[in-house]
Amino acid sequence: NMCGTCGCGSESKGPAILKPGEEKHEHSHGEHIHEHSHEGHHHHKEGHSHTHDHSHDHNHKVLAIEQDILKNNQVLAARNSGYFEAKNIFALNLVSSPGSGKTSILERTLADLKAEIPFYVIEGDQQTMNDANRIDALNIPVVQINTGKGCHLESDMVYNAVKKLEIKNDSILMIENVGNLVCPSMFDL
């Protein structure tokens, strides 16, 4: 399945969206209750012969859920795109493998052009604030999205980060995705 393929788990607490200097805090909203069905689970003693009708498709429900997730992401990405177009914001999604130099290229671009063009940055990372702190040192408005176990940004994360950035019209939004080549390609932002 999709999350098994990309390694992101549904048990994560969701992304943390922070500006440099903000503290990350965790809080609970009550006890999590885990429920699951035992339908299709059969327990047999050793040596007991049995047959089961396996003519149904076990993967049908998983595939439908994955399609719903991708469709929902596409709807939210279209909303983001309309917002960017209405405000004349040029948005770039930077995708590359971990350690390939995305942040270094971004730093150089921002340093060279920030006097001419208003920039805003969204940094995607599983855990750290390191990249956002590097961009903040250039006096560029930036927010960090920590995805936890997630290996890609999604359109709802970008939407919430954009609200926090308060991006002005006629600007450029640079989105540095989580360091991964496969997973981000499935999710338009």
Per-range role (PLM):
Residues 1, 188-189:
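Short, intrinsically disordered, charge-balanced linker/junction segments flanking boundaries
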Residues 2-65:
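Histidine-centered metal-binding segments
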Residues 57-82, 87-92, 100, 104, ...:
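Nucleotide-state-sensitive switch-loop elements of NTP-binding domains
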Residues 96:
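The Walker A (P-loop) glycine that initiates the GxxxxGKT/S ATP-binding motif of P-loop NTPases
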